[in-house]
């Protein structure tokens, strides 16, 4: 029984599905997708649970969410193993994901009060009050790269605001989704407040097409995000928050500490086997001897990175991609760029055929035309050389995406220029592109989102504002508007 609907674990009636470890092919999870009728049932359960959940005092909702945080801490080791085995990422990285999930609770509570709490301004004859109300029933679509942390970033603030939810994990990480929901169950969520439907494209389409949804919160690829945007077009009454990918540039302008710059680049491009939406995809390196030396050192160190199993000891820097098919897609993208005229600096290599273990690849594309403006979700770094900083910014902005951008430089003035001219929601200076803070908004422009940033700003799309002018008693104004006469006339 792999679906959780209205507080009950039930068996899906859709397509049979199984999840294997992307390196060892060990079977980890088996179950059936939710069919359209079960998706509708989950929505009905969420709708029925909404009025009571929304009327709960915030402190009551907060108590359940904080109990979930306690359970995450108590089961951190177990959840770390589940995430590592299912995604293929090393244990150390899976552990940091669970830690981020735990930390998200307190941050979301603070964000609720800061962004969407109640504010009152005293007036001469009463008060002006700002309150926030939950939307109602929201669908949450989770990704596979952070199957615990990223859905958590939607679910926690949405529940705190008083919404009820239907959660569909990625079909590539059903085990993590189920494991997390079981902790929510133990936290004491009332029946129907949070529902789990497993499945792939058909389940997702059934969920996103429900008329009774009040909104949809999505993290995933740009192609799916655009599809959802088209599907919900003409429905302005529904909130749609899209957190999509990027074709992110990292500018290497001035290197005073060669190894520090190489380390920052490795963290930006290859952490999580290149499967972070903020990963550097395009490396822009200044022409000249210093840039040549930097690239040589980068290729040297990156060439020593050996991806390993999730349970290898010593632990590797990177693990496997989410699937062997994902690794094959990266290889095909590299070959395509070679065919366009790219010069391979470091060839990606499958560690073992049929698995998702893939070494990093670096290819120079200076002067190459018709390079696809796409997010290749894996350890493939494209290099361009530039002559001057204005050209670097032009190259950085030469994308339909706009998620993250970074600069390695000793010149603060160059960073200030980048802040003014970059088209990206995250712009870092001498910090990895993959470094983000939950105390700041997270999102991008262009094809990277629809101006609904998450993290600290997630509270904004989980509630709508209600403004009130209030007075405990009704009185006639001392000064009336022109033309109004309230004088009492003698009866004739």
Curated annotation (Swiss-Prot):
GO molecular function, one term: succinylglutamate-semialdehyde dehydrogenase activity
UniProt record, GO biological process: arginine catabolic process to glutamate; arginine catabolic process to succinate
Annotated NAD(+) binding sites: 220-225
Superkingdom of this protein's organism: Bacteria
EC top class named in words: oxidoreductase
Keywords (A to Z) from UniProt: Arginine metabolism, NAD, Oxidoreductase
Xref: InterPro entries: Ald_DH/histidinol_DH, Ald_DH_C, Ald_DH_CS_CYS, Ald_DH_CS_GLU, Ald_DH_N, Aldehyde_DH_dom, SuccinylGlu_semiald_DH_AstD
Catalytic activity line of the entry: N-succinyl-L-glutamate 5-semialdehyde + NAD(+) + H2O = N-succinyl-L-glutamate + NADH + 2 H(+)
EC number(s) reported in the record: 1.2.1.71
Family to which this protein belongs: Belongs to the aldehyde dehydrogenase family. AstD subfamily.
Stated name of the protein: N-succinylglutamate 5-semialdehyde dehydrogenase
Source organism per UniProt: Salmonella paratyphi C (strain RKS4594)
Lineage: Bacteria, Pseudomonadati, Pseudomonadota, Gammaproteobacteria, Enterobacterales
Gene: astD
